[in-house]
Every structure is written in structure tokens, then in C-alpha cells.
């Protein structure tokens, strides 16, 4: 863990708040990629280290290691590439707070695409505006009936959005 942190923050132990304000620095390489440089690097060093815990109101729980996040994000990369997503594309996510959000966001980082997280409470007009204003190429959403209906209603007004699986 220290190796990963030191790669980007040469100093992270400080004597005081003033010391931190004066001396804290983050080194971000030009080719930095969070998916590869942090998530995958951590998975390579400590594959079984806990990365994510998910729970819901019903008491269900899922635990994911860094290896799980790496493997699931790599599967998501393959899916997104098959669907035509490439570096520079913009993808909107409406996935509530499910674990898949983190796998897909990490995958989009690995590809070099931009992610726009969006609320499941959006209405048709909100989708139309956001999709067109941002040039969204793909929208990935939960299967909730209301969300799906608002997305379907917005499609005729969103010419940039690929319509592979409406």
C-alpha cells in the first residue's frame, strides 16, 4: 500500500495542519490512469484486500476485494469495447448505488472514456438535456420501470446516443 501512495504522494505523514498545508503535494503523471495505476496496482500487490462493501436497506451485503474490482472492471472493459466505446467517449450511468457502478467507472477510466453519473430521479427532459449537452454516446441504466420509460421517451430527441439496447 505504501508503495502506491508514495508513487503519487511522496509525503503523507505530517507534524501539523500547517506542515501539511505547506508541504502536501500530489504527483500525477501525464499518463495517470486510476483504473490501472491504483485499482489494478493494488490488486496486484494485495489481491484479497477489501476494496468495497455494499449493503442495502434489506440487509443484503456484498464484499469485494481489489482483485474482484480488477476482474469485474476488466469484464466491463470488454463489454464496453464490444459496444464501441473508446477513449474520449462520454458515458452516462444511472445505476443508483450498486456495486456495478464502481466496476463500470473503473472500466471507463481504463478505456479513457468520461463518465457522467446521474440520478435515477431524472425525467425525460433531464435526460434529453444532459445527453445532448454532453454528447453522451452511451447510457447505462438500472432496469427500474420508471427509469427505463423516461430513457425510452427521450431517445427520439437524442441523436448522438447509440441505440443498441433501448
Named regions from a protein language model:
Residues 1-64, 68-81, 157:
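N-lobe entry segment of adenylate-forming
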Residues 3-4, 82, 103-106, 110-166:
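Structural core segment of the AMP-binding/adenylate-forming
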Residues 32, 58, 99, 144-145:
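Residues that cap or initiate secondary-structure elements
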Residues 39-42, 69, 73, 91, ...:
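Adenylate-forming
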Residues 47-49, 88, 161:
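A general structural motif
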Residues 59-64, 78-122:
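Conserved AMP-binding/adenylate-forming
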